[in-house]
Amino acid sequence: MATSHLTSRSLLVQAQYPISRLPSNLRLSLSHHKQPAAVAKRRRAPAPSHPAFSSVIRGRPKKVPIPENGEPAAGVRVTERGLAYHLDGAPFEFQYSYTETPRARPVALREAPFLPFGPEVTPRPWTGRKPLPKSRKELPEFDSFMLPPPGKKGVKPVQSPGPFLAGTEPRYQAASREEVLGEPLTKEEVDELVKATLKTKRQLNIGRDGLTHNMLENIHSHWKRKRVCKIKCKGVCTVDMDNVCQQLEEKVGGKVIHHQGGVIFLFRGRNYNYRTRPIYPLMLWKPAAPVYPRLVKKIPDGLTPDEAEDMRKRGRQLPPICKLGKNGVYLNLVKQVREAFEACDLVRVDCSGLNKSDCRKIGAKLKDLVPCTLLSFEFEHILMWRGNDWKSSLPPLEENDFKVASDQILNSKEAGSGSALTPIELVNNATSLKKCNLIEGAEKLEDSMKSSFENGMILGSACGNPGVCNSEGIDGTESSADAPIEFSPSNSARDLDPSQTSTLYCQSSLLDKSENGELIEMYPDRCGNSEQSPDVPEALTCLMGSSDEIHELETMRRNCKHLNGSDGVNSDSIVPSYMEGILLLFKQAIDSGMALVLNENEFADANYVYQKSVAFTKTAPRYLVLRHTPRKSHGTQKTEPAKNVRINKHLEEHKVSDHVKKKEIVMGGSRMQRNDHAREFLSDVVPQGTLRVDELAKLLA
């Protein structure tokens, strides 16, 4: 049997028995599913020959070169601020954006140039429907000087022109910008206009494109019913708000009366009329931005390739000075970058979360405003270098700047307070009189005193200098509080004791004016015991001057006495007014043990200073000590024990159950809020409990 030999063999070892291949009609089918028949491949239809159905080329668009004359088409000009469109009769050249156009000349165009206005003014073929025909019904134009009657139904509220000053009339035929604005607004009028528009929701929003051409008509639409247009700026345009305000005033014709942050209040003018406003054609297409030069050069000017790479490498490790939020107000960004350049030559700004185009626009603005050199935009950060030509905006520091500044501060404070001490030159002049004759010494001292009076200076204490009298009196001697400062010539130099030549005790009184109108200072009999130094001449017996000068001198002397009062400071030292508080704190620190004072001998020994420092450090507290902590005021709560406190103690002694304790804790808050008379504890009254009967039974059991 031919089939028995085939079935006795295993299918797994068929390769060991080479046999001839069976015909197709005798083969066994090992699969339970039939294979599907192969589908014939379909042929693609031939591509149409019409160019409208051809495949779109997905490559970079070809750049259109700019001709040498800078006018690639009729009415289109290439300027230093991008593309500009010129129309006959227009007051200025139109642009898509008046504030966000880069300050660089384009290199090439991305599309064929054309005028982006309506079909009436553009040579571009119209690809859509024809414009609708004009309405046969002519609607009357809105006139700001002919307002609808108030209270008319279906009419929105409209503000009249103005405000007008008293005695002035409105100008109906105002042509120029100055005539439309009229007289400058007063401060009260500005405050009233801003306050009326501050909370209004009707506003014009300016975004990343800045002030566009079509916004000019939108502003006039706001001015149709309101005197002030509220403009809110966000994003890139807020980097240079001064440029935004300038372009608004130049292109629209209004006046910026107030701006804070990113909000601008634009006033239309006193004589504004919507009927005679300038009408500009609207842009129906947004023109493609031209090709500008690269913002970031691979090798910036003034750097070598290695230096540029090293700066970019250092910039990756540099922390950013700030992080810009999306649609934020970047009003102080330029100022922050300039201040950062004072400390480091590289500055990094974090722009993560912003659009890529916004980051580059901000970098281009900073490049022109700071100015600086852009190094990279990687990782959504702006890396800037201040450049080799950078100059600090701070004034140069010199060696004597600190001394000059301190002298100026001292002089200003002395002049403001009116209390200061005598300069050293006055003392030196007084002590050097013995080397000069009487007349020359009198002239020198008189000149020095006059100069000190003019500069607002007064005589101070000089105990160690002979011939100078202290305004407060010398040690152990009391002087009159009202006596002016002068020298006593009662005794001659021959009668002076050598021990008395170092001090001078004097008192004086003022008499009436003489015939010449001069005030003469005389001395009473009680000055007979006072001694005079030979350094003081007899010609200085009187000091002549007007009564106003004497009164001013007396006032300054009293202020000096108040300055050198009992504040722990030596009276013969020159102490400025601004040092009083410091010296007082120093004295308090020594008295309280918070400061340690060493003399010259102790300070010279380093080991002694170290030992004293260690011992003084150990006396300080380890933790922070707050001496003036605010105390919590509990109102009129009394400190004596309340009734509920006694009940809680009684419950704790008897070990009350948990639910009873929880109830007492919950009700404790309400008990504390009772009146004071309910909290008072009376000894002759039995306290009433708040427990229920079953709980009392458990406790008594």
Swiss-Prot record:
Which Gene Ontology terms of cellular component type are present?
A: chloroplast stroma; ribonucleoprotein complex
Q: Name one Pfam family in it.
A: CRS1_YhbY
GO terms (BP aspect): Group II intron splicing; mRNA processing
General function of this protein = Required for the splicing of group IIB introns in chloroplasts. Forms splicing particles with CRS2. Interacts with RNA and confers intron specificity of the splicing particles.
Query: Can the keyword RNA-binding be found in this entry's annotation?
Result: yes
Primary localization class, coarse: plastid
Q: Transit peptide positions?
A: 1-77
Subunit: Interacts with CRS2 and RNA. Part of large ribonucleo-protein complexes that include group IIB introns, CRS2 and CAF1.
Has UniProt tagged this entry with the keyword Ligase? no
Please report the name of this protein according to its UniProt entry: CRS2-associated factor 1, chloroplastic
* Keyword vocabulary terms for this entry: Chloroplast, mRNA processing, mRNA splicing, Plastid, Repeat, Ribonucleoprotein, RNA-binding, Transit peptide
The terms under GO molecular function for this entry are:
RNA binding
- The superkingdom listed in its UniProt entry is Eukaryota
Q: Where is the CRM domain?
A: 183-279, 301-397
Q: What is the lineage of its organism?
A: Eukaryota, Viridiplantae, Streptophyta, Embryophyta, Tracheophyta
Q: Where in the cell is it found?
A: Plastid, Chloroplast stroma
* Chain residue ranges for the region called CRS2 binding: 581-603
